[in-house]
Structure formats: structure tokens, C-alpha cells
Amino acid sequence: MASVSFQDRGRKRVPLSLYAPLRVTNDKPLSKVLANNAVPTNKGNKDQQIGYWNEQIRWRMRRGERIEQPSNWHFYYLGTGPHGDLRYRTRTEGVFWVAKEGAKTEPTNLGVRKASEKPIIPKFSQQLPSVVEIVEPNTPPASRANSRSRSRGNGNNRSRSPSNNRGNNQSRGNSQNRGNNQGRGASQNRGGNNNNNNKSRNQSNNRNQSNDRGGVTSRDDLVAAVKDALKSLGIGENPDRHKQQQKPKQEKSDNSGKNTPKKNKSRATSKERDLKDIPEWRRIPKGENSVAACFGPRGGFKNFGDAEFVEKGVDASGYAQIASLAPNVAALLFGGNVAVRELADSYEITYNYKMTVPKSDPNVELLVSQVDAFKTGNAKLQRKKEKKNKRETTLQQHEEAIYDDVGAPSDVTHANLEWDTAVDGGDTAVEIINEIFDTGN
């Protein structure tokens, strides 16, 4: 016996998700803004907290042009929905896989939603990002079906009523005919038929007249509406008049920019703190705040930086390359030794960290050249062959005394960095001792 089979046309009805969809308010895809464990917690046990978000591409036609709209993302549990036959994390366009820790990668059999059911608002174990919103569900289509059934019911009642009236009239007419003689009944029937025919003709004429009037009115309204639409688009108008109408608008917009008060650049957005109010280990030497102003003069254990570095601080050329070899906070805390000594009203904290840098590193020579650079710089200046009198020599000795480790104000906290540039094998061993202490005692 022959059988009939139909091939798949390529369009299928997508199963409905149990939950209301998500929508991203910016241009990023959902996988870039949503965590990979964002599974709704409304249904299923801990083994079934696994599934995928399926993209529904949206657009709108405006004046014959397709305008893209933000996509809706619908959630389906693993083994359900339009991609129910895919294994977990199978790379598929428009699919974002999510799962909670401990979930099994097996079909959940939690099913999908019926068309008459309302979508569930999804709940999550963590707060959604600010750029992700839940699309509120619309009224289910069941209400429209109910309204159609009611309208059909009313139509059936209306169609039934004429038949009932006809039955009643016929029975009443039969009883009257039986009560009167046959001749008189026949004449009455003929007269009634003539009256009915006249009434039906009058009604049909009235309908035709009203239709003619309505057709003219609707045609005029349509022509007027088309004319208004063309005028709004600038079609059929005098182009010079259209330009004159646009000129005042442009002048208005240009003048509005002139009257807008401009920002006063001299106003400071935030009040800058004085250097003395900032702890020494948080100061950044730049601009007017030189290295000497932030950390004191070079000398003793403060032995890093030449004249340019001391003057410009972090703005000096080569600082970024050297800073790449300085340890970060985590390295100081977890990779070195931290010693704490209690003082009268403070703590003295010493950080001791050692690191090995290959000689092949292009920045290590630049760092080594800055160690004790202020001493080397003074020596180079002394090579100049110039005659100096005794008075200038005495002044120079006094100036060099600035670099000695003299006493600092008692309320200043110091940071000590020592660089041991001893060569060990093929690498340069750099030892960093970072001491923060109070000299008040």
C-alpha cells in the first residue's frame, strides 16, 4: 500500500521557553556580560541546573529599511527546546551554555511551555548585571481565543434568532388562515407578499445610496491623507519654500549653542590634598612635587636616581622601564619577609624582598645605572678643569653635606630601598629592602 510523506520545508515552530526572555541594553553579546552559571533557580534540582540561552534576533521595518533591534535570549534546560539534541557546550551560533557547579550533563526532561501558559519571571542566585534586563511577559494568547469563541457564540445566537422568528410567524399565520375563510386568506397573503417585496426594494435602494455616498467620502479621505503624507515628506512642494522653512530652524539651533553657558575650566573638580597630608609611602613625585619634596634628599639609604630622576620623578624618561622591574604589593607581602617593630605610638614595618633578573632584560641596565647615580653625577661634575678659589671649594663641601644621612623631622615616615647590584653568575641579583619606620623616637 502506498504511503504519502511530506518533506521538511525548513520552517519549524520554535518551542516556547518556560521563562521570560533576557535582553542586553548595549551592543555586547550576552556571553560577554552574563556569567556562565546564570541558570534560573525556579525549577529543577541541583543536578538539573544546566541549559542554554537561545538568541531570538529581532528587527523592525521602517520606511522600507530593516532596523535591527536588541535580541531576546530565551532559556531552555539541557535536552529541551530548539537545540534539545545538542550535547552540553556544543559550539553553536546564537547559543550561550550555562550551568551551575555540580549539575549533570544529562537531559533534564523539564520540558517547555504551552502556548496558553504565561512565562515565568526567572530568578537567579546572583544579581544580574545592570545592562541585562528581564522582558516582561505579554498576555497569553488564550485570552484572544476566548474572545473569538465568545464572538462566534454571539454570531450563532444571531443566526438562530431569524429561524425562530420565521417558525413563530408561520405557526401564527397558519392558525389565522384556519380561523378565516380560504378566499380572504389568499387575498391577504397576496397583499402581504406585495408589501414585503416593496419593503425589500426600498431597503436595497437605501443601502445602495448609502454605499455610494460612503464610497465617495472614503475615496476623498484617502486622497487627502495621501496628499498630507506627501507634503510631510516634502514631495509636491515648492523647494524654495521648503528651504525657507528649514533656515529658521538651523539658525535657532546655531543660536542655541551660543547662548549655552560654557564650563569654567578654572574650577577644580576636587580639592587637591597638601603633600604633607599624604603618607610618604603613598606620595607620587610629579610636577611641582619633586623626589626631594616627597622623600627627602638623596644620601645614605636613599640612593636611587640621578639629577633628572630627582627633579622630574615619575615623568623622567626611562621611569616606566625601570618601574617594570619593581615588585608589586603582592610580591612584597607574600614573596618576601615582613618585619614589624612596635614603637611608642606607631609601628616600624620592614619589607625585605629579593629577586633575580636576567642580564638579557633590556631594562635591567637602566635600573642599575640609577643606583647611587647622584654620587656618580657629582663625580662627573668635578672632572671639569676650572680654577676654583678656596671660598668656592668651601661652599661646595657644604653643598655636598646635604646628601649625608642627617636627621629628618620627627613626624616623617621613611621608606628604605637598597639595591644590591652584585653579579651572581649570568644574572643580576637585585635585593629590595623596604623599611617604613618612625624617627620620632
From Swiss-Prot:
Single GO term (MF): RNA binding
Coarse class of the protein's main subcellular location: virion
Keyword tags: ADP-ribosylation, Host Golgi apparatus, Phosphoprotein, Ribonucleoprotein, RNA-binding, Transcription, Transcription regulation, Viral nucleoprotein, Virion
GO cellular component: host cell endoplasmic reticulum-Golgi intermediate compartment; host cell Golgi apparatus; ribonucleoprotein complex; viral nucleocapsid
KW Ribonucleoprotein (keyword) present: yes
Matches recorded under InterPro entries: N_prot_C_CoV, N_prot_N_CoV, NCAP_aCoV, Nucleocap_CoV, Nucleocapsid_C, Nucleocapsid_N
Biased composition regions of type Basic and acidic residues, renumbered to the chain: 238-255, 269-278
Compartment annotation: Virion; Host endoplasmic reticulum-Golgi intermediate compartment; Host Golgi apparatus
Residue stretches of biased makeup (Low complexity): 143-215
Record's comment on post-translational modification: ADP-ribosylated. The ADP-ribosylation is retained in the virion during infection. Phosphorylated on serine and threonine residues.
Chain intervals for the UniProt region annotation (Dimerization): 277-379
Region (Disordered): 131-219, 231-278
Tree of life domain: Viruses
Domain CoV N CTD: 266-382
Domain CoV N NTD: 14-136
Entry similarity comment: Belongs to the alphacoronavirus nucleocapsid protein family.
Assembly behavior: Homooligomer. Both monomeric and oligomeric forms interact with RNA. Interacts with protein M. Interacts with NSP3; this interaction serves to tether the genome to the newly translated replicase-transcriptase complex at a very early stage of infection. Interacts with host RSAD2; this interaction inhibits viral replication.
Function recorded in the entry: Packages the positive strand viral genome RNA into a helical ribonucleocapsid (RNP) and plays a fundamental role during virion assembly through its interactions with the viral genome and membrane protein M. Plays an important role in enhancing the efficiency of subgenomic viral RNA transcription as well as viral replication.
Protein name: Nucleoprotein
Organismal lineage: Viruses, Riboviria, Orthornavirae, Pisuviricota, Pisoniviricetes
